[in-house]
């Protein structure tokens, strides 16, 4: 049996507030499904959560998701998914968009469930925040106990972060993973592709299908974007890279740089690229003059001006330090549970400060926290 495993979709995400970027995510979802169907040898699709970018997706996002699902079903390819943090419903009597499609189409959720197909045991555990770690670990252990009764291949699906893979905010430690029981643990949530072994268990984050920021765009150059195909008969997997249609282009510019060469680099694409110009030892006003010349050839242009002493890695180092300082500041001033709550609230508003969906998510998170602790 050959199984396609797909990471985060984030349908509906409008990067930089641009309609073109929102459409890129829908087109990318279509690319992935078309590739799966064209292979004519995929028996099942597993999706690892964060189908939509928020728990109340637009009609366009819902339609884009359904359109591709219907293509899979026309080819009789079963589809299973788990719930990620972006579509998790925290209010009572609300239906998540994931759940909606289990009623509308012939697809199934693997939230805290397991199935056996062709002698392959597949368990899924829906997302839980760090404040619910005990409940999360209990559910993982419950699925591990069920898996122990099975003699064939065993697969676990999660939408979490493990401490060895994330600087801060991980809900699980490496020791929480039942690697001695499962042959494969596929995880959503982190957008970079990560592959590693723990004993005989392969731990794999397929990564998101599209890039949500420039860090992910740089990562695509190193690791690619796409999905995973698991061959259960051979107990092996294959990484499928599908280049994204819209390019992110990063160009270092100094006094000697040929600007005509810069213009040539960003021209000729079917989709206008997103361009970042990093100027060194150039006056900021001159940098913006240069940027103005090429702006029409870009979907979005960002300009960074640095002095000659700054290294290329300074920006990423500052990001890491700021995350670490936030962690320390919160944990020094409040309890562990309160620190987790505060950081989750920060994450909600960090993405889009003016979004009404974020306000709803923040209210739901607050209600949930105070019901549990007060």
What are these regions, as identified by a protein language model?
Residues 188, 195-259, 265:
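A conserved active-site cap/scaffold subdomain adjacent to cofactor or substrate pockets
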Residues 234-374:
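Accessory, non-catalytic peripheral segments of nucleic-acid enzymes
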């Amino acid at each position: 049996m050959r199984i396609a495993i797909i990471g985060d979709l984030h349908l509906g995400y409008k990067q930089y507030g641009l309609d073109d970027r929102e459409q890129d995510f829908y087109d990318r979802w279509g690319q992935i499904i078309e590739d799966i169907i064209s292979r004519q040898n995929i028996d099942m699709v597993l999706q690892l959560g964060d189908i939509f970018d928020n728990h109340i997706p637009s009609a366009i996002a819902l339609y884009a998701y359904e359109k591709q699902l219907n293509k899979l079903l026309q080819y009789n390819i079963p589809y299973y998914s788990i719930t990620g943090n972006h579509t998790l419903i925290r209010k009572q009597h609300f239906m998540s968009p994931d759940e909606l499609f289990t009623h509308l189409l012939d697809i199934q959720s693997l939230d805290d469930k397991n199935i056996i197909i062709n002698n392959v045991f597949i368990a899924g555990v829906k997302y839980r925040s760090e404040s619910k770690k005990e409940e999360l670990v209990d559910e993982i252990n419950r699925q591990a106990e069920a898996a122990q009764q099975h003699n064939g291949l065993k697969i676990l699906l999660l939408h979490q972060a493990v401490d060895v893979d994330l600087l801060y905010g991980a809900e699980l430690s490496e020791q929480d993973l039942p690697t001695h029981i499962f042959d494969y643990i596929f995880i959503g949530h982190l957008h970079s592709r990560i592959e590693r072994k723990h004993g005989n268990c392969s731990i794999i984050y397929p990564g998101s299908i599209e890039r949500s920021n420039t860090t992910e765009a740089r990562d695509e150059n190193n690791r690619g974007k796409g999905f995973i195909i698991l061959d259960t008969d051979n107990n092996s997997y294959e990484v499928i890279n599908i280049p994204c249609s819209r390019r992110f282009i990063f160009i270092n510019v100094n006094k000697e740089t040929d600007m005509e060469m810069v213009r040539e680099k960003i021209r000729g694409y079917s989709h206008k690229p997103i361009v970042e110009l990093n100027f060194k030892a150039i006056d900021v006003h001159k940098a913006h003059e240069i940027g103005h010349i090429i702006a029409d050839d870009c979907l979005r242009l960002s300009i960074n001006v640095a002095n000659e002493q700054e290294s290329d890695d300074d920006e990423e180092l500052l990001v890491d330090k700021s995350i670490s300082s936030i962690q320390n500041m919160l944990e020094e001033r409040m309890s562990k549970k309160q620190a987790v709550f505060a950081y989750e609230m920060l994450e909600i508003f960090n993405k889009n400060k003016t979004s009404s969906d974020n306000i709803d998510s923040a209210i739901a998170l607050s209600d949930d926290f105070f019901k549990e602790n007060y």
